[in-house]
């Protein structure tokens, strides 16, 4: 994609959302058309089905907020929203197979009530953030780490404002926001007295569309401690602005849990806890940004960080059309959607049997 095209893409994204909203039909108008025979304009039928998934809240309308609720009709729109293509943060999060409260594709398929249709949903930030550790400068009292941070769409650089957070044991460094033309180098300094491993979080906001915010993180060794894979010590679950941290190992002690957005960061309040888990209340932040949540703790003498994003994206769920492509017609439809006022890219694949 040429750079000029990418510029136009982001500059016009909000306008496209408004156009899509104006074109949106109600569920009463959409659903009868979706039951037409396959032979009657199959591409248009598939398009209407893809819209239906994003424009309707499903039944019960608040099924995303309870881990005991399973939708009887499927849709992921936010209940009561005046905007079209405005998705519910908890319904989206429960589509992620890594979420402890995830619903299965079999449950989604059954709730859609269209046995001749398979579907797949992908939701991701509007552009990518890549983090690479490029240099380490070890001193007597501290170590400086240099990172290369790239922001791009299909390999084309995306100018963005960046906010970086560095986390280690009882240590938080918040860098002043900076602007990148697609690639920039950032230094973070961690004292030698602080135990590792460490973590850097980068949130990137497009200069063309302030509601388009992407993110990434990078765990790295500090001192002699190397990072373990995410999920080694805690299983983090998100639902209804509550974080549940379930212990994956014995002798786990939680130190601090923090939430980070582009404009804000906050230490979360623990609401309940026992010897197997702890729960935290997640604030409703004012800015258009995903929330990155980091829990720190120790396992005996080992310090660790665990992290999760709210909404829990990027995600892909549904039918595996890579293995079904010789058996099904498949159409893909791309939409700009909002989740808690931030803009994301959503691709819906719809497939049916060949004629």
Predicted regions: what they are:
Residues 23-355:
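Long, compositionally biased, intrinsically disordered regions
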Residues 1-26:
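N-terminal single-pass transmembrane signal-anchor helix
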